[in-house]
Amino acid sequence: MNKLANQHLIWIDLEMTGLDPNQDRIIEIATIVTDKDLNILAKGPVLAVHQPNTLLSKMNEWCIKTHTANGLIERVKQSKLTERAAELQTLDFLKQWVMKGSSPICGNSVAQDKRFLYQYMPDLADYFHYRHLDVSTLKELARRWKPEILQQFSKKNSHLALDDIRESIEELKFYREHFIKLA
């Protein structure tokens, strides 16, 4: 790993059975590594995490509808992966690209993902720098300071982890070009 790896960014997204890490669980995890300029360097494993039917049946209507339509529930039922196995596969990938503690967690609403990581994938949670690079912060600022630009960027909202990461990277590129003045 070269010195530039210290500037690489880890993009992560989780899909969960709900929003409460005390009762809900992770059902999908994906990662992408970019350079500091947001060019994709590597796509990590995209992993459906097995959860029992008793847990899946407790999901709210939005989760059931969304994750049935996108095929995730079926992938979760077919999966044999535990959260720990998914965590270890993700860490094995990240260790090839980014030094521990050098990258913030990157994505949209990453504080929510981090809550689940601390609960169910603590070794992965500890791999990140303590800072966050949260694209949703820029979205909220644009909504307040320059709302007209929000109509120029649309997301598919497939609610599949890898798609969501790619959209987050593209969204940050959009804000860099149309919202943040870098000169």
From Swiss-Prot:
Q: Which residues form the Exonuclease domain?
A: 9-172
List cystine links. none
The active-site annotation reads 130
Q: Chief localization class?
A: cytoplasm
At the top of the EC hierarchy, this enzyme's class is hydrolase
The membrane-spanning stretches of this chain are none
What the entry lists under CDD domains is as follows:
Orn (cd06135)
> Which Gene3D superfamilies does the record associate with it?
Ribonuclease H-like superfamily/Ribonuclease H
GO MF annotations, alphabetized = 3'-5'-RNA exonuclease activity; nucleic acid binding
The record's section on InterPro entries has: Exonuclease_RNaseT/DNA_pol3, Oligoribonuclease, RNaseH-like_sf, RNaseH_sf
Q: Where in the cell is it found?
A: Cytoplasm
Q: Which GO terms describe its cellular component?
A: cytoplasm
Q: Name one Pfam family in it.
A: RNase_T
Q: Cross-referenced NCBIfam families, in alphabetical order?
A: PRK05359.1
Question: What's the family?
Answer: Belongs to the oligoribonuclease family.
Q: What does this protein do?
A: 3'-to-5' exoribonuclease specific for small oligoribonucleotides.
Spell out the protein name for this chain: Oligoribonuclease
